[in-house]
Each structure stands twice: as structure tokens, then as C-alpha cells.
UniProtKB/Swiss-Prot annotation:
Keyword Transit peptide: no
Family per similarity comment: Belongs to the G-protein coupled receptor 1 family. Vasopressin/oxytocin receptor subfamily.
One GO BP: cellular response to hormone stimulus
Main subcellular localisation: membrane
Entry's localization field: Cell membrane
Cross-referenced CDD domains: 7tmA_Vasopressin_Oxytocin
Transmembrane segments: 49-69, 92-112, 121-141, 163-183, 206-226, 294-314, 332-352
Gene3D superfamilies: Rhodopsin 7-helix transmembrane proteins
Alphabetical list of InterPro entries matching this protein: GPCR_Rhodpsn (IPR000276), GPCR_Rhodpsn_7TM (IPR017452), Vasoprsn_rcpt (IPR001817)
Name of the protein this chain belongs to: Cephalotocin receptor 1
Length: 397
């Protein structure tokens, strides 16, 4: 998404060009009221276009695989699966309505379209940025209730997931409406193109600051709070579960010894072991699933923060510092990092899916081995009891 400073009497294209294929210099001299001609670094422009094309291809392929996989198991989707689905849709929206128009714009240098198309393109680019953050926040809220308030979370239906995501998208469309009035087709020192108008000049600083706060700072604070509380809850529950597990094991061993002394092992010992084993496995399964979902979304959030931080830092720097190095290869690379977020998310989902499959396979094998050992032990106990009864009968006779 582009931000171009427009002064009341003269045009300076010094700020910004997100995903820009153009490296623009416009050294405006207020004293002489002169503007130097704009030069374009074609090599850097070509590199940016190629980078955006690769990002778009990887984003479409990765998220399409995720959506196809979820569609195949659509009858067994959990709430977490639904949020992954919505995150993938958001990434595709970024690819088609943010990265793709920007790549075309970078190729043509000037915006080739009508005034309505200019406003619509920049509006949808802003919507994509808001939605990427707000859908992540909605996912964090769901995971927070699943971990910290499991009883109330069980009452949540899939419809509530869609409502939360719908609210996130509506806020994105609402907060992006200023784009429809800021951007328009205008004549500048590079020709007729789509550019923003900020008059008076302080409105540029205000608008960029608002975008940074609404898209990056506030969502980051919310995500930090939610995941901080979740990690604390998991840690606290892990300690309590470990203590209760040790207590159950001691209690079970005591019952097992007592049954060997004076009670029937088949009537009590084996059945208690079976029930206890199922209970422990059940609790562990839920805990592992929740922790895994938290780790998954936390990885996505961390990736989002890493990719978007340089972009917003550069935006704020350029808005508030007139001497900011707003051009050059390094600055352009930092801006391009934000485009990587939409193409990395699906691969994070796939990696966690592979680890989940391996964990289930390993747990299944361990359960089979445990069951076999338990059955053999029970059979040996039965044989010993049978031999003991025979010896007692022989002694009586």
C-alpha cells in the first residue's frame, strides 16, 4: 500500500511505496521551491516485481493446499480448524487484493486506471492489512477461552467462530474507509497517477500514526496479553496435573497391593487400572491438543510480528523524520518483508500438522504396547490365582 506526501503547493513523492517497484528521489527545496526530476532504479524495480510474483505464487499454492485439506475433512472440523480456514482466506485476500495490484502498479510505474479504480484498489489494500491483524486477534480470543475458561468455551459453536471473524472483517472495511477519500487520480511531476492528498501536512503524520496503532500496536498488545495469560494457565495447570497424577499413582499402587492380599484382582485391580488409564490418557489428550493449538497460533503471531515490524517502523520514521532514508535498497527490502507473512502461514500449518500426525502415531503405538503388557500381566495373575486355588484344594484333601 502506497503513501505519497502531497503538499498544498508542490508534490513530493518522498513517502512511501510499500512493495514498491520504484525507487524515487524527489529532493524538494523549500527555499528555492524547486523539485528535481524523478529517477527510477530499474534493477531494484525488477527485483521487487520478481519477489512479489514469487510471494504471490507461494501464497496461493500454500493456502490452496490448506483449504483443500480442510474441505476434505469438513465434517470433522474443530473451531481451531475453522480459524485456520479463515486465516488462509485472509492470506489469499492479501495476495489477490494487495500484492497482485501492487505488482501490476510496480510494473507500469504509473497507475493505469480510472479514479474509481484508484480509490477501490487502495481501499482493498488497506482492508487486507487490517484483516490480517484482526482475524489473528479473533483466533487468540478463541484460544484464550479454550485454555483459560474451558467450561464456557465448550458452549461455543462453529457459528460463533464465523461471527467473530465477520466482526473482524467488518472492522477492517470500516477502518479502511478514509482510503476512499485520501486517494485519487491526480497530475503530478511523474504524470497522471493515483496518489494521496494530505492537506494540511500534519494529517499525514496523524494518518500514518493511526494506521500503525490500529493495525500493529493495539493488536500486538492484545495478542501479548491473551497469549501471556494462556501460557501462564498452561504452566499452572501442568504443575497441578503433575501433582494429582503422582497422587493417583500412589493410590493405585496401594489398592493393587491390597487386592493381592485379600481381594479379587479381576474384580477391582484390573478394572481400576483400566479406568484410571483411560482417564489419564483422556486428560493428557485434551491438554496436548490445546497446547498444540496455542503453539500453532503463537507461531503465526510471531511470524506476523517479525514481518510487519520493519514496515511500520519505517513508515513511522519516514512520517516523523524529514531526514529519514526513505529510499534505497535496504529500505525497500525492509518494506518487502511484510509481504512474506501471507506466504509463510500455510507452511506453518503444514509443519504443525505433520508433527501432530507423528505424535498421534507414536501415542497409538505406546498405547498398544501398554495394553499388551497389561493384558499379559493380568493373565499371569489369573494363572497364579488358579494355581493357588488348586494348591489350597490339594492341601485340604
Amino acid at each position: 500500500m502506497r503513501y505519497i506526501t502531497t503538499h498544498p503547493n508542490e508534490i513530493s513523492t518522498q513517502i512511501w511505496n510499500n512493495f514498491s517497484s520504484t525507487e524515487i528521489w524527489s529532493n524538494f527545496s523549500a527555499a528555492k521551491n524547486e523539485t528535481q526530476p524523478i529517477r527510477r532504479n530499474q534493477d531494484l524495480a525488477n527485483a521487487e516485481v520478481i519477489t512479489l510474483a514469487v510471494v504471490i505464487i507461494i501464497t496461493v499454492i500454500g493456502n490452496s493446499i490448506v483449504l483443500i485439506t480442510l474441505f476434505q475433512r469438513r465434517k470433522k472440523l474443530t473451531r481451531m480448524h475453522l480459524f485456520i480456514l479463515h486465516l488462509s482466506v485472509t492470506d489469499l485476500f492479501v495476495a489477490f487484493f494487495n500484492n497482485l495490484p501492487q505488482m501490476i502498479w510496480d510494473i507500469t510505474f504509473l497507475f493505469l486506471g480510472t479514479d474509481l479504480l484508484c480509490r477501490l484498489v487502495t481501499y482493498l489494500q488497506s482492508v487486507a492489512m487490517y484483516a490480517s491483524s484482526y482475524v489473528l486477534v479473533a483466533t487468540a480470543i478463541d484460544r484464550y477461552f479454550a485454555i483459560c475458561h474451558p467450561l464456557s468455551s465448550h458452549k461455543w459453536t462453529t457459528a460463533r467462530v464465523h461471527v467473530m471473524v465477520f466482526i473482524a472483517w467488518m472492522l477492517s472495511f470500516l477502518f479502511s474507509t478514509p482510503q476512499l477519500f485520501i486517494w485519487s487520480m491526480q497530475f503530478s511531476n511523474i504524470g497522471l497517477t493515483c496518489q494521496a492528498t494530505f492537506d494540511p501536512e500534519w494529517t499525514l503524520k496523524f494518518y500514518i500514526t493511526w494506521l500503525t496503532v490500529a493495525i500493529w500496536i493495539l493488536p500486538t498488545i492484545a495478542l501479548t496479553l491473551f497469549y501471556g495469560m494462556m501460557c501462564f494457565a498452561v504452566w499452572k495447570r501442568g504443575r497441578s496435573t503433575l501433582g494429582s497424577s503422582r497422587t493417583r499413582n500412589r493410590s493405585f499402587l496401594t489398592n493393587r497391593v491390597s487386592t493381592r492380599i485379600g481381594q479379587s484382582h479381576l474384580a477391582r485391580g484390573f478394572s481400576e487400572e483400566d479406568m484410571e488409564g483411560q482417564s489419564v490418557n483422556y486428560n493428557r489428550g485434551i491438554s496436548r491438543a490445546k497446547v498444540r493449538s496455542v503453539a500453532l497460533t503463537l507461531s503465526v503471531v510471531a511470524c506476523c510480528f517479525i514481518c510487519w515490524s520493519p514496515f511500520f517502523v519505517c513508515q513511522m520514521w519516514a512520517a516523523w523524520d524529514e531526514n529519514a532514508p526513505y529510499s534505497g535498497a535496504i529500505y525497500t527490502i525492509l518494506l518487502l518483508l511484510s509481504s512474506l507473512n501471507s506466504c509463510t502461514n500455510p507452511w506453518i500449518y503444514m509443519i504443525f500438522s505433520v508433527f501432530q500426525h507423528r505424535a498421534k502415531t507414536s501415542r497409538f503405538v505406546n498405547d498398544e504396547e501398554t495394553t499388551s503388557v497389561t493384558v499379559l500381566s493380568s493373565r499371569n495373575d489369573i494363572r497364579l490365582m488358579s494355581m493357588k486355588k488348586k494348591l489350597e484344594q490339594t492341601a485340604r484333601n
